[in-house]
Amino acid sequence: MSLTDKTCVPCQGGVAPMDRQQAEQMLVQVPEWSLDTDARMIYRRFKFRNFIDALSFVNRVTEVAEAEDHHPDILLGYGYAEVRIQTHKIEGLHENDFILAAKVDALGA
């Protein structure tokens, strides 16, 4: 089953975050994303022609995030939006983060 076919499940905490090796294995499924140096977050910078296009993309990401009840951090500027995803409750990465990344990718930039 592909990540886009899955649904984020609520994380109640008490679950260990993925280690670097697990995260790198999951990253293969969302190859445009990068792992931060601590392996606690994935991120991707999307480029656009202008601010309006970037904002439109962020609004579409918001709809997906609300539907999945999993919310990324987003940096927005002229011609770009950077999406950063982690599971805050466990201060690291969970399968949910990669599911959301795949669904953001499916929006097309």
Swiss-Prot record:
The alphabetized list of GO BP terms reads: tetrahydrobiopterin biosynthetic process
Q: Does the keyword Lyase apply?
A: yes
Q: Give one Pfam family.
A: Pterin_4a
Question: What is the protein's given name?
Answer: Putative pterin-4-alpha-carbinolamine dehydratase
What InterPro entries would the database entry show? PCD_sf, Pterin_deHydtase
Keyword Lyase listed = yes
Q: Which UniProt keywords are listed?
A: Lyase
Name the Enzyme Commission number(s) assigned to this protein.
Answer: 4.2.1.96
Quote one Gene Ontology molecular function term.
Answer: 4-alpha-hydroxytetrahydrobiopterin dehydratase activity
Reaction it catalyzes: (4aS,6R)-4a-hydroxy-L-erythro-5,6,7,8-tetrahydrobiopterin = (6R)-L-erythro-6,7-dihydrobiopterin + H2O
Q: Which PANTHER family match?
A: PTERIN-4-ALPHA-CARBINOLAMINE DEHYDRATASE
Q: What class of enzyme is it?
A: lyase
Q: Write down the Gene3D superfamilies for this protein, in alphabetical order.
A: Transcriptional coactivator/pterin dehydratase
